[in-house]
C-alpha cells in the first residue's frame, strides 16, 4: 500500500547486479538497512507516513551511528493511516527529527516525478559524504502519479571508501558501529 518503488526495484535491481530484499515489517526493514549500511553497502528503504513512524527508532540509531542510507517517504497527511492529500505532518517529522534524540536528516523534497528520479543519485552521494540518513520526502499525490521519466545514462562511479564499515577485520583492528559513546 505504500508506493510502487518496491514493485519496480524487485524487478530492476537483479538486472543491474543489485539485491532486493522484501522485509516482513517496517521495523525489520529499517534494521536490515542499519545492518547493510554498517557493512558499507549503499542501501535504501521506502514507505509512507505511518511506516516511517514505525521506522523512527531505527532512523535515530542510524543517525547516531553515522550510517548513510536513503529513506523515501511518500507522505500521508493526518493522524492514523492518513490520506494522500497535502499536509505538513510528515514534513515536520522529517526536518525536525521524528524520533528520540538530537538529530537531523538531510531532506530532499521533489516537486515532480522526474525530480524524484533525478534526486536519487544525489541522495546517495549526500548520505555517503555526510554519513547521515537522507530522506526523499515525496508528496502523497506525487507518489500516486504515473508519467514517463527519463533515466540518466548510467555512469560508472567509484564508491567512496568506507574505512569505518564492518567488513571483517582483514588484518586491521575490528570496527565497531555504535550510536552511544560514553
Positions of PLM-derived features:
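Conserved thiamine diphosphate
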Residues: 86-140, 152
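Short, well-ordered, mixed-charge alpha-helical segments that flank or form enzyme active sites
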Residues: 54, 78-81, 115-117, 142-147
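Detector for methionine-enriched segments
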Residues: 32, 44, 62, 116, ...
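Fold-independent oxyanion-binding glycine-rich loops
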Residues: 23-26, 46-49, 72-75, 109-112, ...
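Conformationally flexible catalytic loops at phosphate/diphosphate-handling active centers
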Residues: 131-182
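Thiamine diphosphate
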Residues: 1-97, 104, 121
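Short secondary-structure transition/capping segments
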Residues: 41-48, 67-74, 118-127, 150-161, ...
Amino acid at each position: 500500500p505504500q508506493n510502487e518503488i518496491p514493485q519496480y526495484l524487485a524487478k530492476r535491481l537483479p538486472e543491474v547486479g543489485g539485491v532486493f530484499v522484501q522485509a516482513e515489517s517496517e521495523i525489520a526493514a529499517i534494521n536490515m538497512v542499519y545492518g547493510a549500511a554498517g557493512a558499507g553497502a549503499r542501501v535504501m528503504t521506502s514507505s509512507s507516513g505511518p511506516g516511517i513512524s514505525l521506522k523512527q527508532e531505527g532512523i535515530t540509531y542510524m543517525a547516531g551511528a553515522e550510517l548513510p542510507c536513503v529513506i523515501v517517504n511518500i507522505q500521508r497527511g493526518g493522524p492514523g493511516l492518513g490520506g494522500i492529500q497535502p499536509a505538513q505532518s510528515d514534513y515536520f517529522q522529517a526536518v525536525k527529527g521524528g524520533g528520540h534524540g538530537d538529530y537531523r536528516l538531510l531532506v530532499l523534497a521533489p516537486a515532480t516525478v522526474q525530480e524524484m528520479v533525478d534526486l536519487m543519485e544525489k541522495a546517495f552521494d549526500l548520505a555517503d559524504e555526510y554519513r547521515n540518513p537522507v530522506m526523499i520526502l515525496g508528496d502523497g499525490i506525487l507518489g500516486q502519479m504515473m508519467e514517463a521519466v527519463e533515466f540518466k545514462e548510467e555512469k560508472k562511479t567509484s564508491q567512496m571508501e568506507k574505512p569505518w564499515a564492518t567488513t571483517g577485520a582483514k588484518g586491521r583492528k575490528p570496527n565497531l558501529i555504535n550510536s552511544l559513546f560514553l
